[in-house]
């Protein structure tokens, strides 16, 4: 056994262990040295000032990032810095959700990043804070973001599967299959793993699906959010509610009918949900017919002729 290198800065796990309950899980994991550094901070004025100085440095880089060949990387570095210094995730101090919102909206109409997996991964980080992820995935499909990436279909299908909606999860995978989601070998492996779980946990629906004469709905035109929300789920609801832009006359800013232009921010949703308390004495509640949820619209995908020929 080789001796330990005394010159290296070894991380004592006891330091991390003391604050592990305040660390938000990440698929990519956390840097041990960054965790130890953030866990050992006493939050003195000096430390806070240091963090603020570093944050302003990232903000200045963003202000001048438009002239760069790859402005997205500046945002990625900023997000990584936030996650390293605030492993607990979204807090008032970290501002993580606001940062994710700013980044995702910055490049929605930038064709350079439509199929950039780095940009898609930032959306996948943001979806963890969304009450109804179906709307976010529909928004991405509407703007042709990540439609050639296996990650998009994996994460979308995982959402339905976690709620026991195996057939809808299968629809998502079928879309990915037709789009030849990349890397395709990874996509195939993920789909095989999904079908094994489906057969194990819901064999009846799996059998009825494979024996069905009519093809399953693939447009998600009638996806019912209430149905999904009421389904038994193992995942607790995130803190933030997802809202979407709605144009009263049905036309988007660019003149296209029904164009889904943008998404509401957490701040906007909080203001909308902040109803001031008033006295109900003598008030009458108007009778209204049950409100129907607006359809999510078709699950549109970008069909590239070159991809179709492959």
Curated annotation (Swiss-Prot):
Record GO terms (molecular function): anaphase-promoting complex binding; ubiquitin ligase inhibitor activity
Subcellular location: Nucleus; Chromosome, Centromere, Kinetochore
PROSITE patterns: BUB1_N
Alphabetized InterPro entries for the sequence: Bub1/Mad3, Mad3/Bub1_I, TPR-like_helical_dom_sf
Basic and acidic residues: compositionally biased ranges: 42-63
BUB1 N-terminal domain sequence ranges: 56-218
GO CC annotations, alphabetized: cytosol; kinetochore; mitotic checkpoint complex; nucleus
One of the GO BP terms on file: mitotic spindle assembly checkpoint signaling
Any matching Pfam family: Mad3_BUB1_I
Coarse class of the protein's main subcellular location: nucleus
Domain of life where this protein originates: Eukaryota
Gene3D superfamilies per the UniProt record, alphabetical: 1.25.40.430
Keywords noted in UniProt: Cell cycle, Cell division, Centromere, Chromosome, Kinetochore, Mitosis, Nucleus
Oligomer status and interactors: Component of the mitotic checkpoint complex (MCC) which consists of mad2, mad3, bub3 and slp1/cdc20. Interacts with the chromosome passenger complex subunits ark1 and bir1.
Function: Component of the spindle assembly checkpoint which is a feedback control that prevents cells with incompletely assembled spindles from leaving mitosis. Component of the mitotic checkpoint complex (MCC) which inhibits the ubiquitin ligase activity of the anaphase promoting complex/cyclosome (APC/C) by preventing its activation by slp1/cdc20.
Protein name, entry field: Mitotic spindle checkpoint component mad3
Organism: Schizosaccharomyces pombe (strain 972 / ATCC 24843) (Fission yeast)
Lineage: Eukaryota, Fungi, Dikarya, Ascomycota, Taphrinomycotina
């Amino acid at each position: 056994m080789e001796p330990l290198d005394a010159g290296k800065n070894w991380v004592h796990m006891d330091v991390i262990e003391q604050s592990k309950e305040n660390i938000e899980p990440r698929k990519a994991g956390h840097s041990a040295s960054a965790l130890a550094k953030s866990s050992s901070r006493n939050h003195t004025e000096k430390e806070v000032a240091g963090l603020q100085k570093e944050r302003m440095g990232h903000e200045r880089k963003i202000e001048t990032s438009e002239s760069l060949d790859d402005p997205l990387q500046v945002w990625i570095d900023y997000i990584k810095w936030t996650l390293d210094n605030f492993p607990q995730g979204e807090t008032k101090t970290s501002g993580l959700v606001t940062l994710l919102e700013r980044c995702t909206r910055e490049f929605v109409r930038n064709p350079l990043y439509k199929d950039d997996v780095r940009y898609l991964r930032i959306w996948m980080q943001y979806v963890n804070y969304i009450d109804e992820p179906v709307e976010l995935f529909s928004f991405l499909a509407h703007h042709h973001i990540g439609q050639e990436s296996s990650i998009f279909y994996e994460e979308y299908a995982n959402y339905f599967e976690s709620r026991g909606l195996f057939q809808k999860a299968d629809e998502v995978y079928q879309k990915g299959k037709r789009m030849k989601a990349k890397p395709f070998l990874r996509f195939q492996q993920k789909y095989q793993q999904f079908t094994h779980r489906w057969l194990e946990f819901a064999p009846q629906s799996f059998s009825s699906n494979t024996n069905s004469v009519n093809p399953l709905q693939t447009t998600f035109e009638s996806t019912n959010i209430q149905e999904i929300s009421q389904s038994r789920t193992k995942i607790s609801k995130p803190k933030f509610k997802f809202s979407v832009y709605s144009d009263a006359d049905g036309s988007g800013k660019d003149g296209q009918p029904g164009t889904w232009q943008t998404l509401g921010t957490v701040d906007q949703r909080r203001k909308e949900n902040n109803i001031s308390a008033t006295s109900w004495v003598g008030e009458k509640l108007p009778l209204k017919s049950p409100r129907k949820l607006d359809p999510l619209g078709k699950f549109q995908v970008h069909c590239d002729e070159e991809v179709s020929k492959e």
